[in-house]
Amino acid sequence: MIKISGKCSWFGGPLDHGVDPDEGLAFIYSVDEAPHLFLATQPAGTSGLARRLNPFVNYIACRWNYDETSVEKLLTTMVIVHSPKTKKTIRAFPADWGPHVDTGRIADLSQGAMRRLGITTDDTVNVSFPDGEELTS
C-alpha cells in the first residue's frame, strides 16, 4: 500500500478560478474516460476539463508516480483520504496530477471531498493507495 501525508487544498469545478478556463487534466483527456467525475455540461465560458469536474464528487489530485501506479490503474482505483483532525475518512477518484511542488501540499481535493472530511485548505490529510483495490462500477 502506498501512503503519503501532508497538507491539502481544493481544485476543479466551475468555481476554481485558479485554473484557466481551457485547462485540461494530466491523464484524463475526455469526459468519456471518466464520466462519473464530470458535470453533465461544460460550464459557460470554459472549455477545459478541470473546470468541468463535478465539485460534489470525491476526487483527488496527487503527484502520482506513474512507475508505481499506472494511468490505467489510476482510472480504475479509488484512494482512501483520512483527516487526522476530524477523524473522518472518504474514498476518492484520482483525477489529476498535482498540486505543484511549490505549494508545499501533497493533494488537491474536490470541494465536496473537503466538506465531507470537515477540513479546509492547508489541513493535513493521509492518502492511501490500496494495492489491488479496483473499482467495481
Where are these regions (language model features)?
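Secreted/periplasmic proteins
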Residues: 1-137
